[in-house]
Amino acid sequence: MASKRKSTTPCMVRTSQVLEQDMLEEADRAKDKGAGMPQSDVTKDSWAAEPEHSSKETEVVEVKSMGENLSKKLQGGYECKYCPYSTQNLNEFTEHVDMQHPNVILNPLYVCAECNFTTKKYDSLSDHNSKFHPGETNFKLKLIKRNNQTVLEQSIEATNHVVPITASGPGSSDNDPGVSVGKTPMTKTGKLKADAKKVPKKPDEAAPENHMEGTARLVTDTAEILARLGSVELLQDSLGHVMPSVQLPPNINLVPKVPVPLNTTKYNSALDTNATMINSFNKFPYPTQAELSWLTAASKHPEEHIRIWFATQRLKHGISWSPEEVEEARKKMFNGTIQSVPPTITVLPAQLTPTKVSQPILQTALPCQILGQPSLVLTQVTSGSTTVSCSPITLAVAGVTNHGQKRPLVTPQAAPEPKRPHIAQVPEPPPKVANTPLTPASDRKKTKLQIAHLKASFLQSQFPDDAEVYRLIEVTGLARSEIKKWFSDHRYRCQRGIVHITSESLAKDQMAITGTRHGRTYHVYPDFAPQKFKEKSQGQLKTLEDSFLKSSFPTQAEVERLRVETKLSRREIDSWFSERRKLRDSMEQAVLDSMGSGKKGSDAVAPNGALSRLDQLSGAQLAGSLPSPSSAIVQNQEQVHLLRSTFARTQWPTPQEYDQLAAKTGLVRTEIVRWFKENRCLLKTGTLSWLEQYQRHHMSDDRGRDAVSRKVAKQVAESPKNGSEAAHQYAKDPKALSEEDSEKLVPRMKVGGDPTKDCLAGKPSEATSDRSEGSRDGQGSEENEESGIVDFVEVTVGEEDAISEKWGSWSRRVAEGTVERADSDSDSTPAEAGQA
């Protein structure tokens, strides 16, 4: 059905030139007809089988408009044929046409490359083709721009599939030379382009040609279908679609035509040249409400005019379907596909009488794009009293399995006296594996390897720069928009706490990818007994330990590096890392048990996996390199201890305290904020068992220091000035605090409104968490001394015992002051923590 639609966009020429050329051409045609040489060039740029009176109406309007232009001819102005715009300036007129009518070509020049024939009128080119190129249908037009002049160069492509079509009627004799087809659709950048100008005829001249005109128009349209199908390329997805079977009776001149009321007030003839409307009608003649709304916005015409235009076009082309047929055709068009096979187009012109006569077969094996439904039928409607025995011309699509086979599959002919348009049966294609339809790039699922690369980049920076994006494009093969969208989604999810991307989870993903690639699955904690391998040397163990300190889950590249350096197999390396992780976890559990945990495993595992993710963080996230595996375990445990100690002191840390915790623990700030949020929720439900243990631990330390506090309280109360000096001295150097200064310091804390209190309260408040756990091996205390951080959690054992006893009495009071300050700010701090 697509072949029946043509754009009637004429070429824009100057008004004076239009009149001169029309008058000359009309005189030439009158001379030819007077000499008794009827012209067969009746292929105008209107759709096939248009009613005769509709063309006359168009001619009358054309003549009237030309008469109106006589006054403008003297002025030398330019008038637009598509809108009332007119101007005296050629540049303004050209700009108007380019902006408002982009499909219009101004003053084209037609050139026939075969004969070196040149003309400015498409009708003259059609006459030239009918005289000098009879029977040629495979014309090719090439658009060329030369010095602000548009040149359409016509050439003929060599083909072996062109067969001349002859049509015979009751009034034609045996020696009729046949009707040659010389008109092809004009193309401009893939769109149909033709000149819709019609030469006005007198009624008495047009009447004798009615019979010949109807026959010629029928055969011309059939040939144009083949010509257009032959010039279209195949779809890229190699899916064959079903084209409507076009049924046109050969005795169309004897069939009464259906009158179409084009002169109604609601019918808008401007829609006949609208490419959007024509394309929509070509796709499906029954538009939905959504399509009507879209066409209303696209064409800027009322919806009622569009409805009437569609109804008129269906009436003109004999399309009348029931609602069930419309629904079925729409389902077949948009939901069903037929396997890709080389299509064979067969045209079977039937005889005019019921007698069986051998019929010529026109077969073309042209690769083409075939669109539409198998139930679409185009035919002339016959009256009830007329009983004409005819089988219409059927354009069918036959599926062929063998690529070398070109024999047409003959469609069964229709029965005589058809009451309704017949549907050509399309042979069912052989069973074949269905082609997977292509999905958009945004709908494709990403592989595990692509996600692993994205997560690794996300850990480094949540806002990647252009260089990182280009690197990800090369590594993952994803589009830039997909990568940007993935980062945006995961930033949102991390802020809401939906997903948490850590180096530990990334390592597990890479291990799973490696296991899938090698045909086996890696288990973090395998249940089976490990296989015994040969003893490893000291150098191999040192290399493995160094790699374990960086990450307990080595990446694929790290495993390959270890294989080269240690000369061990992949299984040996994986087994060693698995055993090493089990040893680390058991030692962590032993440390928790030694601290007095009442319930086994309650400290190591928290609901929702909040604590387990922090306990299993790899050493790669820690600040600095660690000297030994035991230090890594202590440092991991130290992170948990710092967080719990801070939580026991204040449940709502300030943003500055969050930053300090992130610097001390080496954890991501979002992980720390999430940890506090989850533990506050657990505290409300009463399932936070370790909090009581930490609070008891603080209370026991404070009771041991109460004796020293009571002893020095009386002495320091007598000398408040010395207490102030001691406070300032401690602020400068905490290690230089003597016994006498500590005795003067604690009572001074009780005096309100003194700068000494602010000085002492400000100094410990900077240390919102501590590194007391690191002091168990004699290293954490040195770090605390160098950084000036006060330990509020544990009493240090060893060299620092004397100092701890000296200033332990006032540490309790300072800690209480910090807790009170944190509680007072608890109303405003949650919002800040949520934003962090």
UniProtKB/Swiss-Prot annotation:
Q: Where is this region: Required for homodimerization?
A: 195-358
Q: Where is this region: Required for interaction with NFYA?
A: 263-497
Q: What is its main location?
A: nucleus
An individual GO BP term: negative regulation of DNA-templated transcription
Q: Which UniProt keywords apply?
A: Differentiation, DNA-binding, Homeobox, Isopeptide bond, Metal-binding, Neurogenesis, Nucleus, Phosphoprotein, Repeat, Repressor, Transcription, Transcription regulation, Ubl conjugation, Zinc, Zinc-finger
Q: Where is this region: Disordered?
A: 1-61, 164-214, 404-442, 699-836
Which residues lie in Basic and acidic residues bias regions? Answer: 50-61, 192-214, 699-709, 730-746, 813-824
GO MF annotation list: DNA binding; protein heterodimerization activity; protein homodimerization activity; zinc ion binding
Q: Where is the region Required for repressor activity?
A: 263-446
A single cellular component GO annotation: cytosol
Required for nuclear localization: region residues: 317-446
Subcellular location per UniProt equals: Nucleus
Give expression by tissue: Expressed in retina where it localizes to Muller glial cells of the inner nuclear layer (at protein level). Detected in heart, brain, spleen, lung, liver, skeletal muscle, kidney and testis.
From start to end residue, where is composition biased (Polar residues)? Answer: 8-19
Give a Pfam family name: zf_C2H2_ZHX
- Segment Interaction with EFNB1: which positions? 27-77
ZnF C2H2-type span? 78-101, 110-133
Tell me which residues form the DNA-binding region. Answer: 263-324, 439-501, 530-591, 628-690
The cross-link described as Glycyl lysine isopeptide (Lys-Gly) (interchain with G-Cter in SUMO2) comes at K64, K455
Identify residues that carry Phosphoserine. S824, S826
Self-association and partners: Homodimer (via homeobox domain 1). Heterodimer with ZHX1 (via homeobox domain 1). Heterodimer with ZHX3 (via homeobox domain 1). Heterodimerization with ZHX1 is not necessary for repressor activity. Interacts (via homeobox domain) with NFYA (via N-terminus). Interacts with EFNB1 intracellular domain peptide; the interaction enhances ZHX2 transcriptional repression activity.
Functional summary from the UniProt entry: Acts as a transcriptional repressor. Represses the promoter activity of the CDC25C gene stimulated by NFYA. May play a role in retinal development where it regulates the composition of bipolar cell populations, by promoting differentiation of bipolar OFF-type cells. In the brain, may promote maintenance and suppress differentiation of neural progenitor cells in the developing cortex.
The record's family statement is:
Belongs to the ZHX family.
Q: Which PANTHER family match?
A: ZINC FINGERS AND HOMEOBOXES PROTEIN 2, ZINC-FINGERS AND HOMEOBOXES RELATED
Q: What is this protein called?
A: Zinc fingers and homeoboxes protein 2
Write down the species: Mus musculus
